[in-house]
């Protein structure tokens, strides 16, 4: 019998409205993105036109939480911008 693991996702949304990132984590990426797009998430409710530009997958919840916290901090946000530079350029994100 095989093992069953829950997967945890750290994801980055980009708002075409205010040109800002939203970083979060979830167990069900598809459902969570739908919640964001339909205005069910308080922190992104007023940031319509959200697009998923990046995600990572983790088996351990603690690892996903740790990574989310890092990406929300100064060094993590800076490294994320460098990593996603091409994507952000195509979206005309000005703050590289």
Predicted regions located by residue number:
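GIY-YIG nuclease catalytic motif and its immediate N-terminal context
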Residues: 1-41, 48-51, 55-57, 63-72, ...
């Amino acid at each position: 019998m095989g093992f069953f693991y829950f997967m945890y996702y750290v994801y980055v949304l980009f708002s075409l409205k205010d040109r800002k990132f939203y970083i979060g984590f979830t167990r069900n990426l598809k459902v969570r993105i739908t919640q964001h797009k339909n205005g069910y998430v308080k922190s992104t409710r007023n940031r319509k036109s959200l697009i998923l530009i990046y995600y990572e997958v983790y088996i351990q919840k603690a690892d996903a939480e740790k990574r989310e916290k890092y990406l929300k901090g100064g060094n993590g946000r800076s490294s994320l911008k460098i990593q996603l530079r091409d994507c952000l350029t195509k979206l005309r994100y000005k703050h590289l």
